[in-house]
Amino acid sequence: MADAVKLSNLIKDNKSILEVYQGHEYIKDDKIYVSDIYRPGLELTGYFDFYPAQRIQLLGRTEISYAARLDHDIRMHVFNKMATKATPCFLISRSLPVPKELSEAAEEADIPILRTGESTTYISSILTEYLRARLAKRTSIHGVLVEIKGMGVLLTGASGVGKSETALGLVQRGHRLIADDRVDAFQKDHNTVVGEAPKILRHLMEVRGIGIIDVMNLFGAGAVKSRTEIQLVINLVNWDPKANYDRLGFEENTCTLCNVPIPQVNIPVKVGRNIESIIEVAAMNFRAKQMGYDATQTFDNNLTSLISEHSKEDTNKEPHND
């Protein structure tokens, strides 16, 4: 988890939608400590009792038009109170004109002013998601994260079980590698966990007998992705002939990542099993269940119906005593 996000990084990573209107010289050392974006409302009326100065202050059409109705002295007073040492920056949406009083107050307090052509709601959503992802608490997981047909699948299992080799086979079949060996996971929202590779391991994979390979250079940019939502965990286990493995799919297991329960499938590994194909089918079957079709439940319903029909036939065939 990062304690703060540099304002310079926020601007660089969102340069297609953000521009520095004023205060380039103040950007280098500014940091953002919270993910929430604030739209000052009551503050424009002079009420500052609960003003969250540490947030990015976003002014849209409503705020700018209301401020324009205020007298010059009141506007100056309000913007001076909003421009505190804790304020990372002001952001003006829709490429609206920056009030002169805000420009002066920001200059006096060494606060940069940013501007965007995007709508207020859209830019708030984009920056909030960006900040949440970078300020979120991260958990390191030993495993391999791949994306199969748009679904994030985390491969786990004991060292040497073949996670990396399996992931390499999946990449050769057209799927994407996110992270090998170590996955950094964080909770995006209440029900969503996102995984990514540490910067130093991005696009790299360790294959026993070969060493380190660069997946993007070998297979192209379409074979990798920076991050993805973890929707399914597939745990690879060494085949045990004495174990009683689930053959019908009635068992529904979960594991907990970042306090979020994630569905888990245990797949036994042994020589001769095409693990890549099995994992592909497991991912597609999971998606089918999400869409409302459960082959196991359908089989169970059909079997129950068949047993019921045979029971009725047997009852009808029983001899009657006169």
From Swiss-Prot:
Key word Isomerase present: no
EC code: 2.7.11.-, 2.7.4.-
Active site per UniProt: 142, 163, 181 (proton acceptor), 247
Cofactor: Mg(2+)
Annotated stretches, region: Important for the catalytic mechanism of dephosphorylation: 268-273
GO MF annotation list: ATP binding; magnesium ion binding; phosphorelay sensor kinase activity; protein serine/threonine kinase activity; protein serine/threonine/tyrosine kinase activity
Binding site for ATP: 157-164
Binding site for Mg(2+): 164, 206
GO biological process, one term: regulation of carbohydrate metabolic process
Catalytic activity: [HPr protein]-L-serine + ATP = [HPr protein]-O-phospho-L-serine + ADP + H(+); [HPr protein]-O-phospho-L-serine + phosphate + H(+) = [HPr protein]-L-serine + diphosphate
Region Important for the catalytic mechanism of both phosphorylation and dephosphorylation: start-end pairs: 205-214
Top-level taxon in the UniProt lineage: Bacteria
Keywords: ATP-binding, Carbohydrate metabolism, Kinase, Magnesium, Metal-binding, Multifunctional enzyme, Nucleotide-binding, Serine/threonine-protein kinase, Transferase
Family statement drawn from the similarity comment of this UniProt entry: Belongs to the HPrK/P family.
Function, as annotated: Catalyzes the ATP- as well as the pyrophosphate-dependent phosphorylation of a specific serine residue in HPr, a phosphocarrier protein of the phosphoenolpyruvate-dependent sugar phosphotransferase system (PTS). HprK/P also catalyzes the pyrophosphate-producing, inorganic phosphate-dependent dephosphorylation (phosphorolysis) of seryl-phosphorylated HPr (P-Ser-HPr).
Assembly description: Homohexamer.
PANTHER family: HPR KINASE_PHOSPHORYLASE, PROTEIN YJDM-RELATED
Name of this protein: HPr kinase/phosphorylase
Organism of origin: Lactobacillus helveticus (strain DPC 4571)
